[in-house]
Structure formats: structure tokens, C-alpha cells
């Protein structure tokens, strides 16, 4: 960093950003689950969301794989698993406004490779009133059963895993002050 000769060495603060609330929601399935579900190419697919992992201030509610947020400014980070579906992308879709809020990055999970990827989505947005959202996912190649991620497939008596559940889609939500 090079400063001009006239600089006095101080840094000006442009704004304060703080978070008043935080929540985590996810698609949580039993450890016996072998796969996250079929991911079919050709259109956006809604990802499962069924559990509030943490929401101490009640900023989010979940129903039918959709979540509701009240008016405010939010930062959202989501990870969406994919397996052998080639190119993948996730998106945050605003059901209330019938529009996409943000598209995520593109990740590649080769159809012949034994590789699972985590597609990521990061965004900051403001809503003026309560709005319903869902996480959507699209892929290049249909993968039956495993396309939406690989589970543990741990049956009773399995000693390989200490977990009794597996997380697929994970959404972290920060509400700004």
C-alpha cells in the first residue's frame, strides 16, 4: 500500500456493520441415509431444508423446504453438495418477489470421478417486508440418487461413524443491525 505524501496516516471509517442475529438451517438426514437425492438436469431444483440448527432469536422459520425472513438486511452463505453431475450452480430464489436474489459459483463434479463438491453461494440483500426464499440447484448431468450429495449410509451396528445424522444443504444467515 502506497500513500501519497499528503496522507496523515489515519484511516477513515465508512460505516459500521454489525450483526444482531445469526441462524443456521440445513437439510439434516439420518446417518443411515446413503444419498441426498436425485438431481435432474435441465432446470432449477429446490434443495431440501428441514431443520433449524441454531436460531436463538427466531429470525427464520422453515416450511416445505422454504424459509421466511422478516424485513431487514441479511448476509447469507450456503453450501450445496453435488456428486457426479458435472457443472453445478446454486441460487437464492425469492418466492415472494418471484426473482433470483443471487447466483452462486459454479463447481464441477465429473461424471466418471468419485468426487463430491460443495457449491457455494454468498450474498448480501435487503428486504422491505417478510419474504419467503428457497435454495435452488441446477446441474449439467442427471445423477440418480446421489446427485444431491453422498450420505454416510451407516446402518445400526456400524462402528465407522460416530454421527447419527448427516447434513446436506447448509445455510448460514446473519441479520445486520
Label for each model-derived stretch:
Residues 1-22:
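Fibrous stalk/shaft segments of extracellular and virion attachment machinery
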Residues 17-177:
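Extracellular jelly-roll beta-sandwich "head" domains, especially the C-terminal globular C1q domain
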Amino acid at each position: 500500500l502506497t500513500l501519497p505524501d499528503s496522507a496523515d496516516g489515519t484511516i477513515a471509517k465508512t460505516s459500521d456493520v454489525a450483526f444482531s442475529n445469526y441462524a443456521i438451517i440445513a437439510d439434516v438426514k439420518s446417518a443411515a441415509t446413503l444419498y441426498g437425492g436425485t438431481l435432474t438436469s435441465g432446470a432449477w431444483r429446490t434443495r431440501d431444508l428441514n431443520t433449524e440448527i441454531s436460531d436463538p432469536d427466531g429470525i427464520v422459520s422453515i416450511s416445505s423446504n422454504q424459509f421466511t425472513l422478516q424485513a431487514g438486511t441479511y448476509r447469507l452463505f450456503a453450501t450445496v453438495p453435488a456428486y457426479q453431475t458435472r457443472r453445478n450452480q446454486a441460487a437464492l430464489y425469492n418466492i415472494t418477489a418471484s426473482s433470483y436474489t443471487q447466483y452462486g459459483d459454479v463447481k464441477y463434479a465429473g461424471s466418471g470421478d468419485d468426487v463430491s463438491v460443495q457449491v457455494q453461494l454468498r450474498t448480501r440483500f435487503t428486504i422491505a417486508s417478510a419474504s419467503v426464499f428457497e435454495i435452488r440447484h441446477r446441474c449439467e448431468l442427471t445423477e440418480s440418487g446421489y446427485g444431491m450429495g453422498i450420505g454416510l449410509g451407516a446402518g445400526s451396528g456400524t462402528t465407522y461413524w460416530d454421527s447419527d445424522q448427516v447434513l446436506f444443504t447448509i445455510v448460514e444467515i446473519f441479520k445486520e443491525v
